Amino acid sequence: VHRRVKGSYAVIALIAGHGVLAFRDPFGIRPLCMGKSADGTVMLASESVTLEGTSHQFDRNIDPGEAIFIDLQGNVHAKQCADAPTLKPCIFEFVYLARPDSVMDGISVYQARLNLGETLAKRVISTVPPNEIDVVIPIPESSRPSAAQLAQLLGLPYREGFVKNRYVGRTFIMPGQAVRKK
């Protein structure tokens, strides 16, 4: 698959009568991890936080280009299948897609978002006169940690100015601008 399919993917597939196969693209663009429960069952997930809700403890990340096969007896078999795997995760996972309480490839999503706020604060300090900013307002939900960090470092008030409609899906993935505006 790695030689034929270019792009980002983390795949989990049930092979009826044999077991479960999981693999990640050679650059580890999309996250994939494995957890184990006290009784020895194995769970695969895109985010570590998913494991916690099912009494599984994080065991390890599936490496870029690695395949995991879990047979019917629960035995885990791992093999590196890519020629030159290199970790190059998608920044969008850390900025927007992942839950803040997840850890992906050893990086806390929450901490990554705080770091983004700190980086932005340094840039703002060097480019914007202090009296030109009145308040820091996040765009819900994922920008909250970054905005809070930015407000703290700039000594500005942090306010919730937008309310997310929880009954509407993610607008950036809707098929066209007209639908997104609607």
Model-derived segments and their meaning:
Residues 1-182:
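PRPP-associated nucleotide enzymes
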